């Protein structure tokens, strides 16, 4: 059940990423994927605990870990976090650039002045 919940969270994250909308993109997406990455690492730690204990599932856990499945998921989560961080940074850089361009035009612009062309020339 623990793993099933993990899969549903993880794939809902992928569907959210595929339906990416840049206007609604924000820190909540970064936090969501960071949560999934923490979830994977906690799953790996719990598998290590099960493997070190004397349960009968040791061979199952060893075969599960031998395929490097969790390491692949961790790498995927890291790459998605990096991509989302870059997209978020680019979004804020674009907003800052547009504000810089507007602020550089502000000394020339007076909303109450009708002779704007005289100031610019």
UniProtKB/Swiss-Prot annotation:
Superkingdom to which the source organism belongs: Eukaryota
Note: Almost completely overlaps RCO1.
Name the UniProt record assigns to this protein: Uncharacterized protein YMR075C-A
Source organism of the structure: Saccharomyces cerevisiae (strain ATCC 204508 / S288c)
Source organism phylogeny: Eukaryota, Fungi, Dikarya, Ascomycota, Saccharomycotina
